[in-house]
Swiss-Prot record, chains A, B:
This is Arginine biosynthesis bifunctional protein ArgJ. The record marks A178, T179 as: Cleavage. Pfam families: ArgJ. Heterotetramer of two alpha and two beta chains. NCBIfam families: ArgJ, PRK05388.1. It comes from the Bacteria.
C-alpha cells in the first residue's frame, strides 16, 4: 500500500447512488499543500468546477471532497450554493478554512445534489481518515468505471518522495462528456509555478492523448497537491530534479490514462496509435486522432479484423498533409501497408494474430517528415452501446 | 415506376460479391448528357474517382457504370488500369466514346477488382437496358445498405421534366469512410455551369448535413446527368425555373440523404437536430454537428432516454459561442431545458414519449442570435457494432 507523507483518505456511502455503493470521498493533507489544476474547457461548467477553479488558482489546497452519482451540473444558483455548502461541511469537519477545500462531482447532469444526505454524511468523515485508504476514495469516484484507478511513482533515494494519483473515467470511446477526474498527491516540495507547468505538460502527454481539449465534460478536473512533507529540497523548473518530477508525474498520469482507456465503456482492447513521418507534430496528432476516434476502425478492432482500408481512409480524411503512395501501416511490427498498397494475405494473417491480443499498437508512417504523434484508444463493442443506452434508466 | 426520357438501366450479378447478389449496374442516356459532379475530398482517392472526375469536368457524360463489393481503392497503378478497362468495356458495349463513361465503385479497400468477372459480364449488359429498371441499379449499388434508395421529383405542367436519383450508403453513425454514391438523372435541359452550381448547393443541403466534407470515403461521388430529352427550354441561373430546378434537385437529394440516415448501420431512429438562435449559421452548424455525432447522445436515443445532459454537454464543447444560461432544448415540441435548466420530471416524461417514435426532432435554441443549422442523425445501436465488426469476415 503506497502512502504519501501527510495525506489521508476516507470514503462513505452517502446514498447519492441508489445502489448504495460508496459515493463520497475525502482527501486531506495535514498541512496546506501547494496545488495546481487543469479544468474542463467545456463552456458549460458544473458548479463544483466554478467553485474550485479559483481556489486552486489561489495556490493552496488542503482537502478534496469528491462525490459520484450526481454531477451538480446545469443546476443553476442552487447548484452553486450546494457546492459551496459541501465545501463548508468538509472544512468544518476538518477544522480548516473552506477556501482550502476543493469540491468535485461526477454523475448525472441536471439534478440538484441530495443535500440532506450530504449534510448528514460529510461532518463525520474526518473521523475515518486513514493514510492507507486511497483505494476507497478511488472506488467512491467511480460511475460506469469497472475498476478503481490508482497509480504511483517514487523518486530516487537521494531525496525521496512519492507521487500517488487516483482517477475516474471510462467513457472514452468518443470521449464526449464522459467525466474525467484525477487527483494527485505528492509529499514533494515543489515550486508553485513549476507545479502548474509540470501538470499542464503531464496532462498533454497523458489524458490529452486519450481525449482532446474540446471533448471535455462539464465536470472534468485534474488536481495535484504537493504538501512538502517529504522534507526534501524544493523542486524548481529547469533543473534535473524538476525534469525528474515532471517525468514521474507524467508517468502517474499516463498509467491512469491507460487504465481509463482499458476501462473504456465495454472496451476489450487497448490500442496505441502511433504516427511517424508526418510533415510536423500537429499533422501527426491529427492523423492519430482521426484513426483513434473512427467508429469504423474501432469496431474493426473489436472484430479482430486487420482492416487497414478503414485506417488508410481515416488517415486520408484528416486535415494533415498526406501522400497516399508513401503511407506504411504496421500492427505491432507487422507491415500491412507499404507505399500505400496492401502487403498481401500472408502478412495480413499475421496482423490478424496481433489484433487478437488485448493490447497492441498501430503505427502509421506517412513518409513525409519528422512529425510524431500518438493516441491511446479502445475498441467499440456491443457492451459500449448497452452501457450508454442504459446508463440513466 | 418513374421514368426519365432517354435514360435506361440494367444490373447484373457479376460475382464480385460472394453472396451472388447483383453487384454491377449501368445507367445509359440515349444522348450525351450535360453533367456535374461532387467528389470525395479524402486525400486518398480510389481509382474510379481519379478516372471519373476529369471526365465529368469535361462536361458531358452518357453512361455510369457502378459496382459494389470492391472499392478499387489503394490498388495503385493496377487499379487505375482496371478502372479504365471497365469504362472501355462499357463504352464498347454501348457503342459510345469511353470518355463519356463514368465509373464508380464501392466495397472493400485494397483488393484489385476481379477483372475476369467484369470482362465477362460488362459486354452483355447493354442488351438488358430498360427504362424501368432504375431499382435494379439502386439494388446493385448496395453494400451494407438494407434497402435500395430511389427518389424523384416532377416539375410542373408548363415545362414538365423529371429528376430521378439513386443512392447508396448506410454507415453514417460517425460518417467516416462509409462510401456514399448517388447518381441523378434528369431529362431537363440545364445550363452546364448552373447544373454544377445547383448540384453543389443541393449537396450542401442534403448529403452534407448527414456527413461533413472531411468525413468522406475514398470513393464518394455524386453525379447528375441532364440529357435535355424533355425538350423543355434550357434552365439557367437566376431565373424562376432555375430556382425551381434547384429546389427539386435538393428535394431528391434530401430524400435520399434521409434514407441513408434511416438505413444507418443498425439505426432504428431518424433524428433531425435543429439549432436556432446561434450567433451565426456557422456556429449553429458546429453545434448541430457535435450533437448529431456524439456517441453518447446517439446511444441515449437508442435507449429512448431524454438525456438532455449529454446534449447540453455536447453543445458546450463545440467551438460555438454559447451562454449556458440561455440554452433551451426541445424534443419535438416538448421543452426539457429552459434557460440552461431542466424543466422537471413531468416534461421529461413527455419527452421520453417523443423518443419512443421512429422519427423526431431535437431543437436547440442558443438564445444569442439568428444563426440556424441542421443535421440528420440516427441512434447508435448494438446492431451497428455487429455490422461493422463483422463486415469483412
Amino acid at each position: 500500500m503506497v502512502k504519501v507523507n501527510g495525506f489521508s483518505f476516507v470514503a462513505r456511502s452517502a446514498g447519492i447512488r441508489k445502489s448504495g455503493k460508496p459515493d463520497l470521498g475525502l482527501i486531506f493533507s495535514t498541512v496546506p499543500a501547494r496545488c495546481a489544476g487543469v479544468f474542463t474547457t467545456n463552456k458549460v461548467q458544473a458548479a463544483p468546477v466554478l467553485v474550485t477553479a479559483p481556489r486552486i488558482a489561489a495556490g493552496e489546497c488542503q482537502a478534496v471532497l469528491v462525490n459520484s452519482g450526481n454531477a451538480n451540473a446545469c443546476t443553476g444558483e442552487v447548484g452553486m450554493q450546494d457546492a459551496l455548502r459541501c465545501g463548508q461541511l468538509a472544512a468544518k469537519s476538518l477544522g480548516i478554512d473552506e477556501q482550502l477545500v476543493a469540491v468535485s462531482s461526477t454523475g448525472v447532469i441536471g439534478h440538484p445534489l441530495p443535500m440532506p444526505l450530504l449534510e448528514k454524511t460529510i461532518p463525520g468523515m474526518s473521523e475515518g481518515l486513514s493514510e492507507t485508504a486511497v483505494d476507497d476514495v478511488a472506488n467512491a469516484m467511480m460511475t460506469t468505471d469497472s475498476f478503481a484507478k490508482v497509480a504511483s511513482r517514487q523518486a530516487g533515494d537521494s531525496a525521496p518522495y512519492t507521487i500517488l494519483g487516483v482517477a475516474k473515467g471510462a467513457g472514452m470511446i468518443h470521449p464526449n462528456m464522459a467525466t474525467m477526474l484525477s487527483f494527485v498527491m505528492t509529499d514533494a516540495c515543489v515550486d508553485q509555478h513549476f507545479l502548474q507547468q509540470a501538470l499542464r505538460q503531464a496532462v498533454e502527454g497523458s489524458f490529452n492523448i486519450i481525449t482532446v481539449d474540446r471533448d471535455t465534460s462539464t465536470n472534468d478536473m485534474v488536481l495535484v497537491l504537493a504538501n512538502g512533507e517529504s522534507k526534501t529540497p524544493e523542486i524548481v523548473a529547469d533543473s534535473a530534479e524538476g525534469q525528474e518530477f515532471a517525468e514521474l508525474l507524467r508517468g502517474v498520469l499516463l498509467d491512469l490514462a491507460k487504465m481509463i482507456v482499458r476501462d473504456g465503456e465495454g472496451a476489450t482492447k487497448l490500442v496505441h496509435v502511433c504516427v511517424n513521418g508526418a510533415a510536423d507534430d500537429g499533422d501527426a496528432r491529427k492523423v492519430a486522432y482521426n484513426v483513434a476516434t473512427s467508429n469504423l476502425v474501432k469496431t474493426a478492432f473489436f472484430g479482430e479484423d486487420a482492416n487497414w482500408g478503414r485506417i488508410i481512409a481515416a488517415v486520408g480524411y484528416s486535415e494533415a498533409q498526406v501522400d497516399p503512395s508513401r503511407i506504411a501501416i504496421f500492427f505491432d511490427g507487422v507491415p500491412v501497408v507499404q507505399k500505400g498498397l496492401g502487403t498481401g494475405p500472408e502478412l495480413e494473417a499475421q496482423a490478424t494474430d496481433v489484433l487478437k491480443q488485448a493490447e497492441f499498437s498501430v503505427t502509421i508512417d506517412l513518409g513525409l517528415g519528422d512529425g510524431r504523434g500518438e493516441y491511446y484508444t479502445s475498441d467499440l463493442t456491443y457492451e459500449y452501446v448497452k452501457i450508454n443506452a442504459d446508463y440513466r434508466t
